Amino acid sequence: MASQGTKRSYEQMETDGERQNATEIRASVGKMIDGIGRFYIQMCTELKLSDYEGRLIQNSLTIERMVLSAFDERRNKYLEEHPSAGKDPKKTGGPIYKRVDRKWMRELVLYDKEEIRRIWRQANNGDDATAGLTHMMIWHSNLNDTTYQRTRALVRTGMDPRMCSLMQGSTLPRRSGAAGAAVKGVGTMVMELIRMIKRGINDRNFWRGENGRKTRIAYERMCNILKGKFQTAAQRAMMDQVRESRNPGNAEIEDLIFLARSALILRGSVAHKSCLPACVYGPAVASGYDFEKEGYSLVGIDPFKLLQNSQVYSLIRPNENPAHKSQLVWMACNSAAFEDLRVSSFIRGTKVIPRGKLSTRGVQIASNENMDTMESSTLELRSRYWAIRTRSGGNTNQQRASAGQISIQPTFSVQRNLPFDKTTIMAAFTGNAEGRTSDMRAEIIRVMESAKPEEVSFQGRGVFELSDEKAANPIVPSFDMSNEGSYFFGDNAEEYDN
């Protein structure tokens, strides 16, 4: 990928590291995982959870959320300055599920944030360990990406629901740092920028004064993050114009929407990381596994091996299908919400079906849901093969971006040729080519139109047997490419914004 040399690798983003070699990166990522695991073990002790209850993904989510809330400084400050009825700004908590008399019971727990911070720091050798917090945020974000299709949010910002494959990381908090920025899709960045520009249009003081200066710096930083995701000179030049605009307004919004559309074909580079729930790391650490000593990577075989040997349970509502619940969580663990279903199915070794055909709602249980009818079951998170996670958008042809798949953003570096109907796609670009960026727009359209079929194929490595830890013998699966295997299309997934 172009200019990859100037960027830090994932794991460096993950650990805020200076330049490190592969071994150091594996060790520091391992250290982060150890910290999450130790924290989880300690929380299970505090909450007196049995082994089974500690492996329940709903309990894991509550515990993760508690520590994220305890460290959310901006929100904590806000809560202290704007006290609201019934909310103690110094406390955090949530539902914990326990098995009592052969039934699942919900218990609401409340802890001092200070106490949670103490337990977290203690598990992380006294550090704040922000990398570990970000890791949990990305896991929650991947779970949201898999569970909800953000049609409404897209429509609100004037984008098209067909762009949902660009929306990775759309629920990540702003404070998720470099590692968070790396996993955000082009559409997510465009949406954040459009929201900002709209505020500026409606509030004339938004760009003014001391606060306005900070706003402006944030705007330019977001523009640069988005620019870094594009792989063609024309797209980047257009981002420079958006960034340098004196007074961002509707023209910039138009340009951003155009760029988002172009990203359906000229794919941006978006990182993919396998972030697992804390209830996977906890038992592994408890069993004596030393992640720091052994080393760990979020983009290689390690998460696959870990899931191969983990037992995770989930509460199941009366009319839900446990196999479908497993697929939802498997996709979240592998950051595969926007991957081609055929590729995912091949790697998983069982058919992965579209969101609309899944008989399952989200993983979290609302506080008003009846617990009497809740069952629990084992989540099947194992895979048949493993593959390297990609960050290129799948175009490795000599520094020049080529066309990608429309309704997916590749997660796995697996070779495939693409069903690619240029006419359908180019239809999205008829119309508005005037304005300051008309020449750039024309250039971007030209690049898309001239993408040759052989450039349209995705040059990936292939998949590997789980025994092939060094990725020595790639298996290149052949797919029936008559149609695209999109997870979200032709269906009615729940909305995140409900």
Swiss-Prot record:
Keywords: Capsid protein, Helical capsid protein, Host nucleus, Host-virus interaction, Ribonucleoprotein, RNA-binding, Viral nucleoprotein, Viral penetration into host nucleus, Virion, Virus entry into host cell. This is Nucleoprotein. It comes from Influenza A virus (strain A/USA:Albany/12/1951 H1N1). Residues 1-21 are annotated as: Disordered. A motif (Bipartite nuclear localization signal) lies at residues 198-216. Homomultimerizes to form the nucleocapsid. May bind host exportin-1/XPO1. Binds to viral genomic RNA. Protein-RNA contacts are mediated by a combination of electrostatic interactions between positively charged residues and the phosphate backbone and planar interactions between aromatic side chains and bases. Residues 8-21 have a biased composition (Basic and acidic residues). GO terms for molecular function: RNA binding; structural molecule activity. Late in virus-infected cells, may be cleaved from a 56-kDa protein to a 53-kDa protein by a cellular caspase. This cleavage might be a marker for the onset of apoptosis in infected cells or have a specific function in virus host interaction. A motif (Unconventional nuclear localization signal) lies at residues 1-18. InterPro entries: Flu_NP (IPR002141). It is found in: Virion; Host nucleus. The keyword RNA-binding applies. Belongs to the influenza viruses nucleoprotein family. Signal peptide: none annotated. GO terms for cellular component: helical viral capsid; host cell; host cell nucleus; ribonucleoprotein complex; viral nucleocapsid. Coiled coil: none annotated. Its main location: virion. It comes from the Viruses. Encapsidates the negative strand viral RNA, protecting it from nucleases. The encapsidated genomic RNA is termed the ribonucleoprotein (RNP) and serves as template for transcription and replication. The RNP needs to be localized in the host nucleus to start an infectious cycle, but is too large to diffuse through the nuclear pore complex. NP comprises at least 2 nuclear localization signals that are responsible for the active RNP import into the nucleus through cellular importin alpha/beta pathway. One of its GO terms (biological process) is symbiont entry into host cell.
